[in-house]
Regions:
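Generic, low-specificity signal for short hydrophobic/alpha-helical stretches with a mild N-terminal bias
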Residues: 10, 52, 56, 87, ...
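Helix N-cap and loop-to-helix transition residues
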Residues: 11, 48, 111, 166-169
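Functionally constrained cores in energy, signaling, and assembly domains
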Residues: 18, 28, 106-109, 117, ...
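Charge-rich, low-complexity N-terminal segments
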Residues: 1-73
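A short, solvent-exposed beta-edge/loop patch
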Residues: 30, 34, 125-178
Length: 178
């Protein structure tokens, strides 16, 4: 024999009250979620890359580059360096202005062709840039909002400068590398 409710069938008012309680709980959860989540994307804060740069320059077997001086309105937001079995890696990233553009610098003396193929898989050659008498390969990403890159292999290391800016702006950045 099946158990039966002592109250019998719920009335229409009971159903409305139950739905109202559930709607209130869902609304409270949504309100808390919206208050805790900032609708504006937060840009990364600036980082001081000088200590990492000093270590990399002392430890690595190739000239580790960084811009000197950093252009006005540019801020370093990422730095990464690692000594790995495959080679020494140096990365430095900058946001420009309000963060709508970036420029990144990558260097390694590891497996150069493999690193290049991995980092620039969706890029196609677009010619060359000559900067202070040095030739850099121009590459353009195959994307709706393509990155551009300047690439150079020298002294057993590859240097990749890429970003969402024009080739001319990338060239100006390269001129600042020391």
């Amino acid at each position: 024999m099946a158990a039966t409710s002592t109250r019998g069938n719920p009335s229409l008012g009971d159903i409305f009250r139950s739905v109202g309680v559930l709607a209130g709980v869902i609304a409270a959860i949504a309100l808390v979620f919206n208050l805790l989540n900032d609708p504006e994307p937060r840009l990364p804060g600036p980082v001081d890359y000088q200590p990492a740069l000093a270590v990399a320059r002392e430890e690595y077997g190739y000239p580790v580059l960084a811009p000197e001086p950093v252009p006005d309105g540019w801020r370093a937001t990422s730095v990464d360096f690692a000594q790995e079995e495959t080679g020494d890696l140096w990365k430095l990233g900058f946001l420009i202005g309000e963060g709508d553009a970036f420029v990144g610098l990558e260097q390694t003396d590891g497996e150069i062709q493999s690193y290049r193929d991995d980092r620039l898989a969706d890029f196609a050659a677009e010619g060359e840039s000559t900067i202070d008498g040095v030739t850099w390969e121009r590459l353009l990403e195959d994307d709706d909002q393509p990155d551009r890159a300047l690439v150079r292999v020298d002294g057993g290391a590859i240097t990749i400068v890429r970003g969402t800016v024009s080739y001319e702006e990338l060239e100006e950045f390269v001129r600042l590398l020391r």
